[in-house]
Amino acid sequence: QVYGGEKIPSKFFMESDSCKRCHEDIYNQWNSSAHHFSSFNNQWYRKSIEYMQDTIGTKPSKWCGGCHDPAVLYAGKMDTPIKQIVHTPEAQAGLGCMMCHSIADVKSTMGQGDFYLEYPKLHEFAASKNPLVRALHDFMIKLNPEPHRRVFLKPFMKQQTAEFCSSCHKVHLDVPVNNYRWIRGFNEYDNWQASGVSGEGARSFYYPAKPQQCADCHMPLEPSNDMGNIAGKVHSHRFPAANTALPTANEDAAQLKATEDFLTSGALTVDIFALSPARANLKTGAVAQHELATTFAVGEEAEAKITPGAAAEAVPVTAPLNRVQPAVRRGDTVRVDVVVRTKRIGHFFPGGTVDAYDTWLELKGVDDNGQTIFWSGMVEDNGKGPVEKGAHFYRSLQVDAHGNPINKRNAWATRAVVYVRLIPPGAADTVHFRMKIPEKTGSRITLTARLCYRKFAWFNTQFAFAGERDNSPSRHGAVPAPVTPDYDDTKMAFTASLHGISAKVEKIPDLPIIAVAGNEVALDVLPANAPAPQPQTQLAKEDWQRWNDYGIGLLLQGDLKAAQAAFEKVTEVDPQNPDGWVNIGRTALQEGDVARARTVLEKALALNPKLARTNFFYGSLMKATGDYDQAATHFQIVLAQYPRDRVVLNNLGRVLFLERKYAGAVKVLQQVLAVDPEDLQAHYNLMLCYNGLGDEKMSKEHQARYLRFKADEASQAITGPYRQLNPEDNNERQSIHEHVSVPLPITTIHAATTPYAVTTTHVGTAALGRPAGQSPTAARATTTPGAQR
């Protein structure tokens, strides 16, 4: 919306070069940024909108235009098929300086372009074609820059940076665009706000030394003599993040380096931590489901509901692997546990449109003869093709109404989510690999783990640059395969012309795979007839956080016994640290072990009576046992330190409701909606509270909002056929699961002068997912929709 209902001329969003006269460094940074390439100068976005308009018409594409295409939208051109206007100046403008700097206020944290714009009349002088008028404008600004600063750098932009960014970095879809219902898309704001990183989340596993906002990471200070400099520095308008695709397609080496440096700056860590005998029958646990209708993960912004799984008792482990001398026997099968931890990241990893990336954990084992004995997360075609389907992915896997994967950024057709796996800020994921030790293995195995990232996914890039419909029959037998707003049964071929694509060179780019973090350990190999290696641990005080991270990953997947065992190690190495006791209590609460939870949480309170997370979980314990007064007391201790923690507010409101203090509960729950108007739990409890107060109108209003945001539970039935066709994805869907190696070369040991003279015979290509002799491109061009990536 625009203040006063004014019309803003589209050229206002196309004249960033007028800013260059005084802000050259900032302009040059922006010129390479993803903001500049947000529109139809970005082939990935361009193709998604062309496909959208071909499928459901031009009108729904306006849903995206408010944040991606202001010049096109305000010129009234989004009713025209983009294919007809893609090379016009409006379509190539992207998000210019004026788009962000003319925002006068953010209306809410609901995102989806929920801001007010203000059109500064003096813009016409700044962008005048008359050089004398421009010179006069610039002279007046230099004479007194304060009015210019007040117009384009408003206080809320610094004071409420995250809310400012949320207006476009939090997204939902609804009936006008998907002909279905409200559903959450990506969401960088809520999980940041609810985490310890923001300084507003009380329940995080870790609190940072200092709260961080979006710009602290994504607009770091850089040296500059630009007129907007602060002590010789400006905030980078490269907006460094994770988009390696655009600078690759644009052949922009400086932007690509800035992005790669950002990705590898230590925001995440990988730790090959533990080794244990493989479980005979792994209990996978229940599939995690969210109450909110969402295609994205839900973090600390909602109360965790973890379904217990796995074995009744924890299996002893050998850990940490770099502290002991781990050994395996030839012929045995072992489990290797790798911990991925988010450290300096303020939102889920990965973030953004997580249905469209390749993000996965690779584990490779190579013996001292150079033989690869294990490989999960291999990339086909010598590292240029798709990632093998059995890898451990971090993404959202969605399907349309016919169970076809959402792999063309066709989010409007999403009807069900197969799984979402992202790592919350300040948390961890514990990944399990099942490794068979071959009989003919060397005397030492080196395990290498890499957290790999490729923007975009292989299939999405092929589609964006060369995708076109293959008119062969659909898997349902229809010719041509039907396309509707609810599903697309067509197959895709990557044979379209590259002429006129939005890239520097007319070719499909070979996108880099970035190793965001990695780790390496060595295992000794024992003869098959040697005694079985016994579990061994070495406890060092400096490793308390590694044990804690290991436990966090196990807790979040519902392996509660193993998580408890890990947290107990924390208390052994540092009994004065309350975190180990708190996390044992947190685990006991999930398990329903009230007595144990009370014991350990009271121990934690004795160590630090004011620690917010301890008070929250102790308050939750009191609530579970019906001691509502004590529960409220501990929740209020938390809120005195973290007044904007939504889950604590929701719990206090719930306690007041249970005590029939309806008016007090309403007051507390309204504070939740001030943080997020879409909070599902707040609407549910407000519905009940207003019903208790006899206010039928308000009760029905919150009931309607609750039902609007609540998940469509019946939609999960759609995933069944897809999961049957794609067992690797069904495995990944389970809260607790293991990954095995791709088929590897068969190695035969010949009798020779050296003990390990090696000859290698390769397994046929059919074992890697395609018929022998068929090219990978041909195989993927004729893949059925249910198997496309």
Regions found by a protein language model. Give the residues of each.
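Intrinsic disorder/low-complexity segments
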Residues: T748, A752-R789
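Primarily the internal scaffold of c-type cytochrome electron-transfer domains
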Residues: Q1-S10, I26-T55, K77-P425, V431-T441, ...
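TPR/TPR-like (Sel1-like) alpha-helical repeat modules
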Residues: A674, L680, Y684-S715
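Structural signature of tandem alpha-helical TPR/SEL1-like repeats
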Residues: L556-K569, Q576-D579, L589-A606, K610-R613, ...
